[in-house]
Amino acid sequence: DEIQQILIKSAADLISLENPNYQYVAARLLLYSLRKQVIDKLWDHPHIYEHTKKCIEKGVYDPSILESYEKKDFDRMENWINHNRDYDFTYAGLRQVIDKYLVQDRSSGEVFETPQFMYMMISATLFAKYPKNKRMSYVKKYYDAISQFKINIPTPVMAGVRTPIKQYASCVLVDVDDTLPSIFSSDMAIGRYVAQRAGIGINAGRIRGINSRIRGGEVQHTGVIPFLKKFESTVKCCTQNGVRGGSATVHFPIWHQEIEDIIVLKNNKGTEDNRVRKLDYSIQISKLFY
């Protein structure tokens, strides 16, 4: 294995404008290493039904897939799956798929599938609830489209839709109201969705501005920045199932009381007290402005 890794690195180092085809040499070497780890062979892949059962036994695939499809359905998938499409990857593309999207134990580094198994299982999972007289044609068409790079899939779907922790939505909008129960409930929802691999959009425009009256003037509002810091901490304390760090975009209307402070929240100048740099921001403009 160490010799194989040296060969992969050597081929990758030779990739250049003058010798671009080394990207395929490095990709083939990396693919052979992956296949040896996953199936212990270079050419003879297991039947997709056996592969699925094995991954379910290891706890990395959702068992419901075997309840949704019969053995004859898996036989059709086996006829459609084309492992030679793995050779279409460049080195950079295959490396990204292995590092980010293949189901694996990120503690031990053990990988449980190859790219074509990944693509077929994604397709089968997405159409599992479709009418039985139509879904297999959808499975094939979608598999062909994604395995031949005709369409792209968002990270939450590509990385985990076939696992026990499903996440079909790549992005989730959390609408925050101007009450403490809503703000704290939204914070919990943000944390759970980030842990489920979703990107987050936060509509925080209804949170009132700094020094606004609360309970008839008994309390003055602390403003949006303390709550944004809370959201920032929640987003960054979780990763998207080990694939990448959480991310969120916060939306504010342009007429918000604190808009002048909001638009500089990512500015390098300023202190940690008045900056929230690890979130992204969007300013909403209505038709009154154009």
Q: What does each of the following model-derived ranges do?
A:
Residues 1-290:
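Extended catalytic cores of very large enzyme megasubunits
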